């Protein structure tokens, strides 16, 4: 399919063909079919809340999770044992709860941070002290989205720096710390990849907190579930982040073609051939 697409001159047609033949949507209630039956039975005996509570009492490593019920999860090359790829800047409000929510699913990770002034750094260092399989990585440059002074001040350089601490050919999953994760469903999703080139792209639901109440966000079409985006589980083979210049409205993610001097410098994931 990749070879065929190379000879199709129109980008939109190539994209449509790839989407039709290469992408597979997996419903949440279908994921259990990817797990060995014995493992599934063991995992379903436990819940996220009990494991999170158990892990809060653990100091110095060895936190517990669903990965304890499959020996393959001990393999550092297995998709069942991905590195959490985390970047933080001033997210103290949600940071601790988000990190604790992934522990029953994820055994290790790197936590990059920069320019933190709200106590996020202290939360990260305390978390990594309690769970030393997570590595704190302080980026030594300020990130400047608009008019960056140097390459080191650009977001893509920050991503590449943090990712450099993840061993090559091992799996990673991009974790955002303004998200709260269902660890059981997250861990089960790691059974989806069957080949090293398989990639999982996760959808999500957005919540709005207003006047002491939570609301589920719906788009103009009334849809709750957001389309899968850049929250990926992928093998760290020939990956790198590249600069992409975006117009002011970052929600539309329009690539800047004119007025480059006022564009914002973001990042896009690429794979070296």
Locate each region found by the language model.
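Short beta-strand-to-loop acidic/aromatic patch adjacent to the donor-nucleotide binding site
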Residues: 169-180
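Catalytic-site signature of metal-activated, phosphate-bearing donor transferases
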Residues: 3-72, 149-160, 179-273
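Active-site-proximal specificity loops/subdomain of glycosyltransferases
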Residues: 60-79, 119-171
């Amino acid at each position: 399919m990749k070879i065929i697409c190379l000879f199709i001159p129109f980008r939109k047609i190539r994209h449509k063909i790839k989407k039709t033949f290469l992408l597979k949507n997996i419903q949440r209630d279908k994921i259990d079919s990817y797990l060995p039956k014995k493992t599934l039975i063991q995992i379903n005996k436990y819940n996220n809340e009990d494991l999170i509570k158990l892990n809060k009492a653990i100091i110095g490593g060895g936190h517990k999770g669903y990965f304890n019920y499959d020996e393959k999860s001990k393999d550092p090359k297995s998709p069942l044992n991905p590195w959490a790829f985390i970047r933080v800047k001033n997210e103290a409000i949600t940071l601790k709860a988000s990190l604790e929510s992934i522990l029953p699913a994820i055994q290790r990770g790197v936590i990059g941070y920069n320019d933190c002034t709200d106590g996020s750094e202290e939360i990260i260092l305390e978390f990594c002290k309690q769970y030393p399989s997570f590595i704190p990585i302080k980026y030594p440059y300020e990130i400047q989205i608009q008019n960056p002074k140097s390459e080191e001040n650009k977001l893509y350089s920050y991503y590449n720096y943090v990712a450099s601490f993840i061993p090559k050919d091992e799996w990673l999953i991009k974790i955002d710390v303004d998200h709260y994760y269902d660890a059981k469903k997250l861990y089960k999703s790691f059974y989806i990849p069957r080949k090293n080139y398989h990639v999982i792209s996760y959808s999500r639901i957005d919540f709005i907190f207003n006047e002491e109440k939570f609301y589920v966000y719906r788009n103009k079409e009334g849809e709750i579930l957001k389309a899968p985006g850049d929250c990926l589980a992928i093998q760290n083979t020939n990956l790198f982040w590249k600069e992409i210049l975006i117009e002011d409205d970052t929600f539309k993610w329009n690539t800047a073609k004119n007025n480059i001097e006022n564009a914002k410098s973001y990042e896009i994931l690429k794979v070296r051939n």
